[in-house]
Design a protein with these regions (language model features):
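Glycine-rich phosphate-binding loop and adjoining beta1-alpha1-beta2 segment
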Residues: 30-52
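Conserved Rossmann-fold NAD(P)-dependent oxidoreductase catalytic core, especially the SDR/UDP-sugar
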Residues: 94-95, 99-152
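Conserved small/polar residues in nucleotide/adenosyl-binding loops
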Residues: 230-236
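NAD(P)-dependent short-chain dehydrogenase/reductase
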Residues: 168-213
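Substrate-positioning beta->alpha
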Residues: 159, 190-191, 207-226
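NAD(P)H-binding glycine-rich loop region in Rossmannoid oxidoreductase-like domains
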Residues: 44, 50-100
């Protein structure tokens, strides 16, 4: 059985659609107050059989910071996708975001080891690579450089990655996916998908600088491959 954390998020919902097309059993973790209707809506973007596919998901309420709840969700799982994370660039969220992202990943890694999970796919971010000198190109081998201009979010994702690497050194079979800014059909009123709504309304401004973008559907498709074929040993994959 496949277990997905962050199933009601942008990446998690599109990933669930990909998984539900197979005969594999799938369980998704959500917070108690999360609304799964968004996932059904995402499914409807793909197919008229959205309801039938949506019914294949076993939903479990669990907090990533609650070990007992998380341990229950892991029972019977063989492969895990860790998509859940708090995304914020507001300095006032730093302490809670750092704790949530890092400790949540620590718990996932520890339970993957305890439950002998065959493969973990951890969704990180290009932000986890940090800023390079003179905006030099980056790849999967670019080392992290401590810098005061690294965002709190970037630091939280970098340290979360360190927990996954710790798990790898302890014998966990894992892959880390590092997408750029993820775009695609989702919650039009929040997150990166807001840009579509703003442009539709006639937003006529743009910022200087450069960035990378990737379609959420491509992210979901790429995530399936290294988990389906557990013998693949690419520890980190950048998606831009």
């Amino acid at each position: 059985m496949i277990l997905v954390t962050g199933g009601t998020g942008l990446v998690g919902s599109h990933l669930l659609y990909q998984i539900c097309q197979s005969e594999t059993k799938v369980r998704a973790i959500k917070r108690l107050q999360s609304n799964t209707e968004f996932v059904r809506q995402v499914f409807s973007y793909y197919t008229e059989k959205a309801d039938a596919l949506f019914q294949k998901i076993e939903w479990v309420d669990a907090d990533l910071l609650n070990i007992s709840e998380l341990d229950f969700a892991f029972k019977g799982a063989t492969k895990v996708y860790h998509c859940a994370a708090w995304i914020s660039f507001n300095p006032k969220h730093k302490t809670k975001m750092m704790y949530t992202n890092i400790e949540g990943t620590t718990n996932v890694v520890n339970l993957c080891l305890a439950h002998h999970i065959q493969k973990l796919c951890h969704v990180s971010s290009v932000a986890a690579i940090g800023n390079t000198i003179n905006s030099a190109p980056i790849d999967e081998k670019t080392p992290w450089v401590n810098s005061p201009i690294n965002s709190c979010y970037a630091l939280s994702k970098h340290r979360s990655e360190m927990e996954v690497w710790r798990g790898i050194h302890e014998g966990l079979n894992a892959v880390i996916i590092c997408p750029a800014i993820i775009m695609g059909p989702g919650k039009w009123e929040k997150g990166s998908s807001m840009i579509f709504k703003q442009v539709w309304k006639g937003f006529s401004f743009y910022a200087s600088g450069t960035n990378g973008f990737v379609d959420v559907r491509d992210v979901a498709n790429v995530m399936i491959q290294p988990v389906s074929y557990t013998h693949l040993t690419l520890p980190t994959i950048l998606l831009v």
